[in-house]
């Protein structure tokens, strides 16, 4: 057991270093950019988004970057989304509302909605964004300036995650921990290794010519995790993508409460693991060994496990402070967070892997 405890301690020491390197080397959107430049087509799929769609639309219409068109694909919403979009389109001609059609065989709903939006778009740059996002007024201009400066095919913008309530504060930091602690994201910004491709519904901005060259969303028509798939497709073609911190400009509350988090990630976590039962099992075992077992052994007074818990805590405090998350949850919630995501992994594997049926936003589809 001491050998295992030593391995876990070394692994967390490396994770601590990796977190520091990522925080130092993942660039922020620094350039404010001008008000003019190439036409940017913002494409938003909206399915039953009455809760925040108006905030999102108004944030994009308030951008200081003037050469912008906003395309929202109303993906057959059954709530007030359509009425909210009609009202805002009547007030500003830059908002184009498309009424989404039923997906053809072989297509999932979101990639089909994005594909429809891309066919209508006229922009040299395409910005794919989810429907529950707030962008500060200079965000689009800053993203365009960074892409032009660095000559990349695609940029992914990382947000600030708004959290309220117990389970959101416990579970949602896993997304940031994955990017900043588990992955060498800084290395992905300097290579075209496909497996380091990171995409996000909070902002994938891509040059039209590169989007078309990789086949657009038609090449991702059955992708459950289409945003990550887009980044990896770009990288597989030999093109560069970069990740930028935009947590001072972009914010969203992704899910409201633990049940929404559970349901939301049930639909796509197994897909994110490559639909591999082996990888799902490995992630569960690793989650216990590297993230929960040290806390259990620390209770017995095992010295290296106590040191591991200290390293985990310092790593979380450092990351949470940088991202402006609540520090009290950094101190104690790590094993509970990992246990929660273990449950999500099991549920996602069962529902989408074994049963192969997903219900989301009032729609059922084959996983």
Predicted feature locations:
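Acidic donor-binding segment of Leloir-type glycosyltransferases
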Residues: 57-104
């Amino acid at each position: 057991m001491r050998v295992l405890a030593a391995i876990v301690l070394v692994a967390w020491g490396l994770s601590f270093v990796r977190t520091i390197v990522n925080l130092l080397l993942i660039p922020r959107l620094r350039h404010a950019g001008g008000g003019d430049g190439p036409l940017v087509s913002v494409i938003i799929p909206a399915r039953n988004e009455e809760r925040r769609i108006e905030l999102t639309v108004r944030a994009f219409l308030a951008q200081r970057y003037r050469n912008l068109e906003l395309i929202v694909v109303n993906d057959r919403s059954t709530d007030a989304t359509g009425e909210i979009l009609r009202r805002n389109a009547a007030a500003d001609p830059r908002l184009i509302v498309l009424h989404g059609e039923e997906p053809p065989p072989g297509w999932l709903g979101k990639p089909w909605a994005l594909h429809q939006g891309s066919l209508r778009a006229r922009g040299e740059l395409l910005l794919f964004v989810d429907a529950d996002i707030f962008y500060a007024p200079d965000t689009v201009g800053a993203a365009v300036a960074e892409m032009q400066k660095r000559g990349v095919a695609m940029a992914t913008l990382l947000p600030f995650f708004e959290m309220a309530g117990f389970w959101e504060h416990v579970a949602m930091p896993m997304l940031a921990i994955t990017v900043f602690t588990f992955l060498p994201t800084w290395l992905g910004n300097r290579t075209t290794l496909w497996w380091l491709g990171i995409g996000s519904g909070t902002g994938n901005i891509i040059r039209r010519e590169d989007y078309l060259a990789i086949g657009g969303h038609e090449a991702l028509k059955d992708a459950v995790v289409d945003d990550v798939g887009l980044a990896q497709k770009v990288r597989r073609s030999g093109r560069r993508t970069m990740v930028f911190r935009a947590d001072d400009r972009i914010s969203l509350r992704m899910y409201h409460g633990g049940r929404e988090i559970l349901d939301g990630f049930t639909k796509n976590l197994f897909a994110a693991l490559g639909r591999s039962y082996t990888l799902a099992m490995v992630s569960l075992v690793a989650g216990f060994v590297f993230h929960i077992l040290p806390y259990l052994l620390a209770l017995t007074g095992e010295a290296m496990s106590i040191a591991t818990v200290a390293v985990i805590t310092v790593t979380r405090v450092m990351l949470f402070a940088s991202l402006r998350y609540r520090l009290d949850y950094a101190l104690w919630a790590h094993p509970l967070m990992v246990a929660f995501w273990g449950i999500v992994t099991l549920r996602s594997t069962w529902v989408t892997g074994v049963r192969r049926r997903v219900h989301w936003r009032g729609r059922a589809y084959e996983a």
